[in-house]
From Swiss-Prot:
Transmembrane helix listed as a keyword: no
Assembly and binders: The phycobilisome is a hemidiscoidal structure that is composed of two distinct substructures: a core complex and a number of rods radiating from the core.
Cellular component aspect of the GO annotation: chloroplast thylakoid membrane; phycobilisome
Domain (PBS-linker) ranges: 11-191
Record localization: Plastid, Chloroplast; Plastid, Chloroplast thylakoid membrane
Keywords: Antenna complex, Chloroplast, Membrane, Photosynthesis, Phycobilisome, Plastid, Thylakoid
Role noted for this protein: Rod-core linker protein required for attachment of phycocyanin to allophycocyanin in cores of phycobilisomes. Linker polypeptides determine the state of aggregation and the location of the disk-shaped phycobiliprotein units within the phycobilisome and modulate their spectroscopic properties in order to mediate a directed and optimal energy transfer.
Source organism superkingdom: Eukaryota
Family the entry assigns: Belongs to the phycobilisome linker protein family.
InterPro entries: PBS_linker_dom (IPR001297), PBS_linker_sf (IPR038255), Phycobilisome (IPR016470)
Organism per entry: Pyropia yezoensis
The protein's name in its UniProt record: Phycobilisome rod-core linker polypeptide cpcG
Length: 232
């Protein structure tokens, strides 16, 4: 018997507020779609937008491209929604995101990249994590793509995007998801031996040559003491 999706409360987010802009400015995201039979160049832009949304720019590699899916989309054999589904369920996406994160963080990444919003709370992370554990990765992805929320905002022919990241009432927009949620979480960075202090210290302590202490300066003695303390 499968466990049903646990209930979770919603929280205040920009994407839950209707927009009444008469003519949205250039800061609003462009919605890439295949409704109007795009040309070859326009289709290239649509495909690039899909890769950028799902893999994020720092994960777009030659190994993540899927020429078979691209060909099916170009010849109208599948819709954007199916193309997104294929990218998320690909072996490349699994290796780059699922295998290097726990279920909670993977849920956060998928909600951001598929639904175009941040998770509402920890309860939502838990609810979707239970789905992954009980029904598997494919069922989790299908539930997101087949949800009413996805259908209302993107349908079958629009590439997902971060919804209402910038609103006119605020001087600054929300942080883009690719910066807010990098590939690795803090726990996996420690596991892989990549603590940030290894490289941040020398960068922050850099001094131009003319500002470096001369022989006999007390600062040199203090630096020597600090170096010795690190090896205790």
């Amino acid at each position: 018997m499968s466990i049903p999706l646990l209930k979770y409360s919603l929280s205040t987010q920009n994407q839950r507020v209707d927009g009444y802009e008469v003519s949205p400015g250039e800061e609003q995201p462009r919605a890439y779609n295949t409704d109007n039979l795009p040309s070859a160049v326009e289709m290239d832009e649509v495909i690039w937008a899909a890769y950028r949304q799902i893999f994020s720019e720092h994960q777009i590699l030659s190994s993540t491209s899927d020429s078979n899916l691209e060909s099916q989309l170009r010849f109208n054999q599948i819709r954007i929604k199916d193309f997104i589904r294929g990218l998320i369920l690909s072996e490349s996406f699994r290796k780059l995101n699922y295998d290097v994160n726990n279920n909670y963080r993977f849920v956060e990444i998928c909600v951001q990249r598929i639904l175009g919003r941040d998770v509402y709370n920890e309860r939502e992370k838990l609810a979707w994590s239970v789905v992954i554990a009980s029904k598997g990765l494919e069922s989790f992805v299908n539930m997101l793509l087949d949800s009413d929320e996805y259908e209302e905002n993107f349908g079958d022919s629009i590439v997902p995007y971060q919804r209402r990241r910038i609103i006119a009432q605020r001087s600054k927009g929300e942080m883009p998801f690719n910066l807010k949620t990098p590939r690795y979480g803090a726990d996996f960075k420690e596991k892989f031996g990549m603590p940030q202090f290894i490289w941040q210290g020398p960068v922050r302590q850099f001094r131009p040559q003319e500002q470096r202490p001369k022989a006999g300066d007390p600062a040199l003695f203090l630096g020597m003491v600090n170096d010795l303390a690190l090896f205790k």
